[in-house]
Design a protein with these regions (language model features):
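Long, contiguous binding/interaction regions
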Residues: 3-155
Length: 155
């Protein structure tokens, strides 16, 4: 597995008083498990045939002690099913869901979340949030120190 440079993300949300339902729902999603998948669900690729009509088969990989170290899905021809990877990069803007939540403060009318993503900010998630929660104010700062780029995602 190739390890990415990590991008730190700090997201501030605000409720204008008329959008409490949207604000509360978005906070719930961001504070939960696998928030990107909850906001913008990934297709269930193990249940979707490839172009040849074949379903991938789960393979469990164990170390010498018999401990599971990885699980992969492969097609009958041995090709790894990497459709999830391409879908995530194309739709979320990063290959994995958020990692290492380091802040999650939610108070009356505002919230702040901090987390890491692989390589870059998740542009697709930001766009989906703006689309699905249009009345929630959002400020999204990112910093990728390995490649020395940082900034705010545009509103």
């Amino acid at each position: 597995i190739i390890m990415p440079n990590w991008c730190e993300n700090r997201v501030r949300l605000s409720d204008n008083g008329e959008t409490s339902e949207q604000f509360d729902r978005l906070c719930e999603l961001l504070d939960g498990d696998n928030p990107f998948n909850a906001i913008f669900p990934m297709p269930d690729f193990p249940k979707i045939p490839n172009d040849k009509g074949e379903l991938p088969v789960k393979e469990v990989h164990k170390n010498d002690k018999g401990e599971v170290v990885a699980e992969t899905y492969n097609f009958p021809d041995g090709k790894n099913d990497d459709r999830w990877y391409h879908w995530c990069v194309d739709n979320w803007g990063t290959k994995w869901d958020m990692c290492d939540k380091f802040t999650a403060e939610i108070d009356e009318g505002w919230a702040e979340f901090g987390f890491n993503t692989a390589w870059s900010p998740p542009y697709g998630i930001f766009d989906k949030i703006k689309e699905d929660f249009p009345d929630v104010g959002i400020s999204w700062f990112y910093d990728e120190p390995g490649m020395e780029f940082a900034g705010y995602l545009p509103n």
